[in-house]
């Protein structure tokens, strides 16, 4: 396991689940529930992975334009109601770039708060209408998570984690990630969009079954 993992087990059959998300993607927040419902009793290591839907200088979306209200009315709000998730289209305009928030994620990961950071950032934007593109807002959230606010702000101002974030984006490109959320389960199963608990659970159990068969078909130094 590493600092980015939310692990519910420590056995050799632990299945990795990589989740690429962006903090301004409502479907990433909606994916949290199915993910945890499917895996709460399974041996998995969940790692949230950075992905910028609209990196600078690509213009970000504006809630007063037609697109966001339309997609929220057609897809986000109906799904959220079915899932019982409290989520609201933020009024922050234009929507923030998320590079700085993701550099903050790298700081959080290095200081043992990666698992809490991504869900907290999603709640800050979609439930609290906070501008997560602002350093002062990010620093307040970091303090809420028990991180050193001064050290956090200093690191982001200095660009200490810029290279780590750029490497994370290269990893996303290597996995051919183009949408958020994207889940890679055990390096074998790929799910794009909000998954159902059944999809995730089946993928994890299938991999664990394959691991069990592979382990059973070998002899160790102490016998077969």
Language-model features, listed with the residues they occupy:
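Compositionally biased, intrinsically disordered low-complexity segments enriched
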Residues: 4-14
């Amino acid at each position: 396991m590493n600092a980015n993992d939310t692990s519910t087990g420590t056995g050799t059959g632990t299945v990795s689940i990589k989740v690429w998300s962006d903090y301004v993607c409502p479907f990433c927040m909606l994916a949290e529930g199915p993910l945890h419902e499917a895996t709460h009793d399974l041996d998995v290591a969940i790692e949230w992975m950075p992905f910028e839907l609209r990196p600078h200088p690509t213009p970000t979306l504006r809630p007063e334009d037609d697109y966001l209200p339309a997609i929220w009315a057609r897809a986000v709000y109906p799904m959220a109601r079915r899932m019982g998730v409290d989520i609201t289209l933020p009024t922050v305009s234009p929507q923030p770039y998320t590079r700085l928030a993701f550099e903050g994620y790298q700081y959080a990961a290095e200081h043992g708060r990666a698992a809490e950071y991504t869900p907290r950032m999603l709640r800050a934007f979609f439930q609290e209408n906070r501008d997560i593109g602002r350093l002062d807002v990010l620093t307040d959230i970091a303090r809420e998570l028990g991180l050193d606010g001064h050290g956090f702000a200093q690191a982001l101002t200095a660009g200490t984690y810029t290279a780590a974030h750029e490497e994370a984006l290269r990893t996303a490109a290597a996995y051919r990630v183009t949408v958020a959320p994207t889940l890679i389960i055990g390096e074998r199963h790929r799910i794009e969009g909000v998954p159902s608990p059944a999809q995730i659970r089946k993928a994890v159990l299938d991999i664990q079954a394959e691991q069990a068969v592979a382990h059973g078909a070998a002899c160790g130094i102490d016998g077969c």
